Amino acid sequence: MSINDLVLKVNDVLTGSVLIIALVGIGLLFTFKLGFIQIRGFKDGWNRTFGGLFSKKGDAGKDGMSSFQALATAIAAQVGTGNIAGAATAIAVGGPGAIFWMWISAFLGMSTIFAEAVMAQKFKQVGDDGTVTGGPVYYIRGAFKGTFGKVLAAIFAVLIIFALGFMGNAVQSNSIAASWNTAFGIPKIAMGIFVAVVSLFVFTGGMKRIAKVTELIVPIMAAFYIVGSLIVIFANVTAIPAAFHDIIVGAFKPAAVAGGAMGATLKLAVQKGVARGLFSNEAGMGSTPHAHAVAKVNHPVEQGFVAMIGVFIDTFVILNLTALVIITTGSRTTGLTGAQLSQYAFSTLYGKFGEIFIAICMLFFAFSTIIGWYFFGEANIRYLFGAKAVKIYSIIVCICVALGSLQEVELVWNMADCFNSMMVIPNAIALVALSGLVKKTHDDYYNNFLPNQKKGK
């Protein structure tokens, strides 16, 4: 049995039952417990997000981030290869219906990430020198006192370091290298080394440099991809109704619209949709709370609103555009997968520039994700080993980025799925245990903080 076959068997267990039950269960729990906060709080989140866009130099504290910088760092991590290569892989393997399950995962995930951000704010740590840090390890320990809390937090910390810092960033590098090799013929290892060197420069600047880079890159890369995608979609506007038909019908009857995904089944559509949805928007995975924890806000719920917008932008905007480009152009029946499928879809209108367009987007999307994931992993390195281990960690991450460019794409994606799925378990256990505190904090915002704020107190 090959390593890939072994990883696939583990993934079948995790994504076939454990992951779906955990993500859907937690999403439903917070959706109902918080009264559909993803709908009620959407306007607040939207206003805070785009208000922050024009005042992103807001107070970040001595060693923290502004609310916008925290969101930019979170989106930098969320909007990565999962939105281009991951969405394409989900469609190629699970059929168009996989996109529907990504929608469901994202809708429920908006309430989950709200809870994650609120708890990250609630349990964040501020050092004597003003340095702010936070993340699931702190609210896991807050949820469970004694040895169990310490052990569960340590397990999560180890998982996220491997899942994102090492394996996840290898995936990002792999997709950059593959797309640039296709578009420009550049050797994969050359791109891997280039990305690793630039990444190291950003890493050595700490939180402040990471925040400055992400708040600059994220709005530009998102706008560039949105415009480029809309042009292709509107060029195939007559195919849009059929595309949504295939997504909806394919969610429940994959064989009816399988096309290129001849082996598509309902189980496969759900598995690929939820797994790729998790890898893309990261709700419930426990990654983005590291960014939301260090934001300077007046109440934890305020950052919860902002966090929800990250999932919305990632899945309902960016990922949807990729899906519609692939489906409306008829590219899903080509037998291609990953970044190559997305490149082919864009090339149906742009020609050779389509490959170049995806290569450029992939570089910025994946590079920004590498930065975000490094930051998340670093927080856990500090938690486990202290600041002295950060330098070694940054070097190992860069080695993974360089070597990840050469790995077999299927194995890299499958291993990333495996580690991402395992991260959900300790995070989910803590969120369920803290659900009462999430509700209490939510109620405090609406019953006390907001009325007092309106009175000018």
Q: Residue ranges of each PLM-predicted region?
A:
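Flexible loop linkers connecting adjacent transmembrane helices
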Residues: 36-65, 89-96, 111-147, 332-349, ...
